[in-house]
Amino acid sequence: MQKLISRISDYNTSMDNGKSAKKSAKITTKTGDNGTTGLLFGGRVLKSDARVEAFGTIDEAVSSLGLARALISDPEVKSIVETLQRDLFIVAAELATLEPNRDQLVETNNVVSESMVQKVEELTDSLKENLNLPNAFVVPGDSPESSAIDVSRTLIRKAERRVVALYENKHIANRDLLRYLNRASDLAYVIGRYLDREKPFNKLN
């Protein structure tokens, strides 16, 4: 997975004195100065491309979840949030790979799968067991932790909309990408409510 992340960022590895070694990540590559970015396993597209918008929004969600995780004190919830972050790296990797090159992701098990969807469903159900969710909209903002998670939820929803557009235009074929993001935003919503479970929900009447 680290190899995939480094390739997304155009990081470089090198050989030093005949031994395999990694240099410090090269942040400034200048390869994107013309407004394009490299995809995994080959190909370059404009940074304004719909595919880049999709995995860029995933990046926003991952970073937002990182802030939420830093605010959360409950170790179980922190672990769940980190699981979401790591899963979203896999989502980003698949979005950053053209369909003809997807087999290379499959070989390393770095594709979104039914098992990932099921895992998120199970995590959601486990948290819901301890909740009495209101049948109404909840106004975000009852705690810093839940507020951060709610921002993450909206970013995951935004990413889902971008991915739906890619799917409808046949740029991606894996429907589990859509299913995963839909479930992930559900999980984020439940996490937010779980964090505030000791307080009365601020419902929109």
Please report, for each region that a protein language model flagged, where it lies by residue.
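Phosphate/pyrophosphate-binding loop motifs in nucleotide- or prenyl diphosphate-using proteins
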Residues: L4, Y11-N205
